[in-house]
UniProtKB/Swiss-Prot annotation:
Homodimer. Belongs to the fatty acid desaturase type 2 family. Residues 1-28 form a transit peptide. Transmembrane segments: none annotated. The gene is ACPD. This is Stearoyl-[acyl-carrier-protein] 9-desaturase, chloroplastic. Its cofactor is Fe(2+). It catalyses: octadecanoyl-[ACP] + 2 reduced [2Fe-2S]-[ferredoxin] + O2 + 2 H(+) = (9Z)-octadecenoyl-[ACP] + 2 oxidized [2Fe-2S]-[ferredoxin] + 2 H2O. Binds 2 Fe(2+) ions per subunit. PANTHER family: ACYL- ACYL-CARRIER-PROTEIN DESATURASE-RELATED, STEAROYL-[ACYL-CARRIER-PROTEIN] 9-DESATURASE 7, CHLOROPLASTIC.
Length: 411
């Protein structure tokens, strides 16, 4: 049975922040324990930079845990195979100046010279990507909320627990590498970045996966492909600006994300084989909610709309766009052969119809939104010493409307 906690009014991804629910000093995530106006008006320490949704827990029927228990051997053979032995993995030091070498200072100087050719807009996006990677403790925590697959002891030898720990260990290199690169580049305000990371980890994330591995693995499938695209595009742009070393860094991270995407999509593919009706309804549920980006609770101590503003720069320079969102959904629909599912219940068929019709609907809404965005504006980002970066004009209103509209449509 699903437990509904903390009845806070839901808001879309793009609504303005609610200052009355935040302390002026602390803005890390918490969930209010009452829906009363009296409680809502009290500023609490460590409250979120934006409200989280109504919290639903343990929505998966307990008997479905048996499905994941029965897939233990399958996961060992088919999912753990997508991990690399530590000794065969690249490490951040492979791509950075060697501090123990006599040429360290010269190598740093060369890195900084290359970094000078990169525009501020690019650094805003690279910093945002790095901060997202650095919030890894949150993502491991999220995976360990999932019923039937969590690491029950911290060192469990189940296939699911081994995957979660090893995946986390591989992902840990990404934030380490980008963090060190940005530190050496001299182009960014590291203290503001470090504060943003601390705020974000303290805030957590609100993926609305309800402790369900169905929802959780659909979410991670989408997110790994999104990060693969994002890092691939930062690699492309670095190359265009002449920084081949940085392009290599971003490309190696993208390669990891692609491998992880393959593992997660394979899990969901197996769920479609084992329980097509339950899986297609979970897919539709996740898409109705909209896939929230992992760093959507991002805050730097100053900008209440930091994530939206960072996302707008990423959209403008072509690192991650609304078109990419539709492309990912279309890819997953094809990858999991959703259109070809048969023998579904009435609710399952409605979910199937909804999902298959969603990509073109998002594209149409995005085209209309783009037609209305005729200008751009500039905003200061603390990450780049309050220099200005160009954003799309009214990004939250225009692009948020896309998701408000498609989420409101019924099956």
């Amino acid at each position: 049975m699903a437990l509904r906690l903390n009845p806070i009014p839901t808001q879309t991804f793009s609504l303005p922040q609610m200052a009355s629910l935040r302390s002026p000093r602390f803005r890390m995530a918490s969930t209010l324990r009452s829906g009363s106006k009296e409680v809502e008006n009290i500023k609490k320490p460590f409250t979120p930079p934006r409200e989280v949704h109504v919290q639903v827990t343990h929505s998966m029927p307990p008997q479905k845990i048996e499905i994941f228990q029965s897939l233990e051997d399958w996961a060992e053979e088919n999912i753990l195979a997508h991990l690399k032995p530590v000794e065969k993995c690249w490490q951040p030091q492979d791509f950075l100046p060697d501090p123990s070498s006599d040429g360290f200072e010269e190598q740093v100087k060369e890195l900084r010279e290359r970094a000078k050719e990169l525009p501020d807009d690019y650094f805003v996006v690279l910093v945002g990507d790095m901060i997202t990677e650095e919030a890894l403790p949150t993502y491991q925590t999220m995976l360990n909320t999932l019923d039937g697959v969590r690491d029950e002891t911290g060192a469990s030898l189940t296939s699911w627990a081994i995957w979660t720990r090893a995946w986390t260990a591989e992902e840990n290199r990404h934030g380490d590498l980008l963090n060190k690169y940005l530190y050496l580049s001299g182009r960014v305000d590291m203290k503001q970045i470090e504060k943003t990371i601390q705020y974000l980890i303290g805030s957590g994330m609100d993926p609305r996966t309800e402790n369900s591995p169905y929802l959780g693995f659909i979410y991670t499938s989408f997110q790994e492909r999104a990060t693969f695209i994002s890092h691939g595009n930062t690699a492309r742009l670095a190359k265009e600006h002449g920084d081949i070393k940085l392009a290599q860094i971003c490309g190696m991270i993208a390669s990891d994300e692609k491998r992880h995407e393959t593992a997660y999509t394979k899990i969901v593919e197996k769920l479609f084989e084992s329980d097509p009706d339950g899986t297609v309804m979970a897919f539709a549920d996740m898409m109705r909610k909209k896939i929230a980006m992992p760093a959507h609770l991002m805050y730097d101590g100053r900008d209440d709309n930091l994530f939206d503003n960072y996302s707008s720069v990423a959209q403008r320079i072509g690192v991650y766009t609304a078109k990419d969102y539709a492309d990912i959904l279309e890819f997953l629909v094809g990858r999991w052969k959703v259109e070809q599912l048969t023998g579904l219940s009435g609710e399952g068929r409605k979910a199937q119809e909804y999902i298959c019709g969603l990509p073109p609907r998002i594209r149409r809404l995005e085209e209309r939104a783009q037609a209305r965005v005729k200008e751009s504006s500039t905003l200061k980002f603390s990450w780049i010493h309050d220099r200005e970066s160009t954003t799309l004009n009214a990004p939250r209103e225009e692009h948020g409307e896309i998701f408000r509209q498609y989420r409101s449509e019924k099956c």
